[in-house]
């Protein structure tokens, strides 16, 4: 079989859906249960928090959940925290979901929801910039107090009640949730806590995604957040899932990998989903016929490493100041892909006190280059960053 570059099945890049969501089957099966409980019983499950490093596929999973909910006729919206105030981002994403709902359901059954949402959105955007595509008057006194936590709780309640009446569900997805302010996180916690007190729980699910620091941030916003969510870690793929990510897309095109070639590719990618897609793409581009062999892999790995270096690591490295790079080098030497203590890092850069590196540490956290998995610890937000740093002059 000739390997055709035009038919390349791999899709490297931020947020791009790979051909196979390898290793994520348990999570998707869990969402299927949420869907069925909402549609068959009118009941909601606990909301989810997905946490993991950069490039492991959190955004891809949110997009997949959005597609599944939308195709099932749910009221589904996806927003991103940190770009604009969260009330504005949620309103903007919900407008599209409301417009879709008006095309699927009789307007009369949506009238109360649309009126409440109109009042909520006017509080967020007083100029009235959001158009629902239908004439609707705002309903005063429910979700328009101007207190985001109270208004969001009221809006979620109306959304859940409407969905139950329609025999469907609501899915709210928020990406980069670690970028939300403490008050925005507290508002989300309050709204979800309020939903869970209904008996039976209303069929609205929120799925937030963010860095591994997100669970601690939610708990700092309100202490009960530790028990509020179903926390799911999205990590590196194990060997079998990594194998599926590389082999299944080519098998569908009658192209195989020989054993040595596959072993070399797997050993280099270390289960990192972003890198696996880059490896697959460049190996395919170098291959001429099936089966893919070790020479194809060796050539492809050079290009894949260059793509990941230039597209993922280099921009992060170049955003750091010299002092911040010193701290990153120390973290790379001490921890690799794990964690190091602030005291160890301070000693490694020749500082007698941890306070002497606190400015550089805080700036690196703000830039999203490192995070604090626990008090007094630091780790890189991107797998493999330590290897890139080791290759720098």
Regions found by a protein language model. Name each.
Residues 213-229:
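Short regulatory helix/loop adjacent to the ATP-binding pocket of P-loop NTPases
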Residues 43-64, 349:
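Walker A/P-loop nucleotide-binding motif
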Residues 242-311:
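Amphipathic alpha-helical "lid/sensor" segments that cap RecA-like P-loop NTPase cores
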Residues 66-85:
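Conserved catalytic segments around the Walker B and adjacent sensor/switch elements
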Residues 2, 7, 54, 260, ...:
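C-terminal leucine-rich, beta-strand-based interaction scaffolds used for sensing/assembly
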Residues 230-241:
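Conserved AAA+ ATPase "SRH/arginine-finger" region at the nucleotide-binding site
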Residues 139-212:
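Conserved Walker B catalytic segment
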Residues 1-46, 96, 112, 200:
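A short, basic N-terminal segment
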């Amino acid at each position: 079989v000739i390997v055709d570059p035009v038919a390349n099945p791999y899709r490297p890049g931020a947020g791009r859906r790979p051909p196979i969501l390898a290793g994520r089957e348990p999570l998707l099966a869990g969402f299927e249960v949420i869907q069925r409980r909402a549609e068959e019983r009118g009941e909601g499950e606990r909301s989810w928090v997905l946490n993991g490093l950069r490039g492991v596929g959190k955004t891809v999973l949110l997009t997949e959940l959005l597609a599944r909910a939308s195709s099932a006729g749910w009221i589904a919206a996806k927003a991103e925290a940190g770009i604009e105030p969260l009330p504005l981002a949620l309103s903007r994403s919900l407008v599209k979901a409301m417009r879709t709902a008006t095309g699927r359901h009789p307007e009369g059954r949506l009238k109360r929801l649309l009126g409440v949402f109109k009042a909520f959105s006017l509080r967020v955007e007083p100029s009235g910039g959001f158009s629902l595509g239908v004439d609707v008057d705002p309903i005063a006194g429910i979700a328009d107090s101007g207190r985001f936590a109270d208004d969001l709780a009221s809006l979620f309640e109306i959304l859940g009640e409407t969905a139950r009446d329609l025999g469907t569900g609501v899915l709210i997805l928020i990406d980069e949730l670690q970028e939300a302010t403490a008050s925005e996180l507290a508002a989300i916690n309050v709204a979800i806590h309020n939903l869970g007190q209904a008996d039976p729980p209303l069929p609205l699910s929120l799925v937030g995604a963010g860095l591994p620091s997100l669970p601690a941030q939610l708990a700092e916003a309100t202490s009960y957040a530790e028990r509020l969510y179903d926390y799911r870690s999205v990590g590196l793929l194990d060997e079998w899932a990594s194998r599926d990510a590389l082999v299944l897309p080519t098998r569908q095109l009658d192209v195989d990998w020989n054993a040595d070639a596959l072993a070399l590719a797997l050993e280099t990618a270390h289960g990192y989903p972003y890198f696996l897609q880059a490896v697959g793409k460049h190996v395919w581009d170098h291959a001429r016929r099936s089966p893919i062999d070790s020479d194809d892999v060796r050539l492809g790995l050079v290009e894949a490493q260059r793509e990941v270096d230039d597209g993922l690591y280099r921009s992060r490295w170049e955003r750091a100041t010299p002092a911040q790079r010193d701290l990153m080098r120390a973290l790379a030497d001490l921890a690799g892909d794990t964690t190091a203590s602030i005291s160890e890092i301070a000693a490694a850069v020749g500082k007698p006190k941890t306070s002497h590196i606190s400015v550089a540490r805080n700036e690196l956290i703000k830039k999203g280059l490192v995070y604090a998995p626990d008090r007094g610890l630091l780790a890189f937000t991107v797998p493999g960053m330590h290897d890139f740093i080791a290759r720098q002059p």
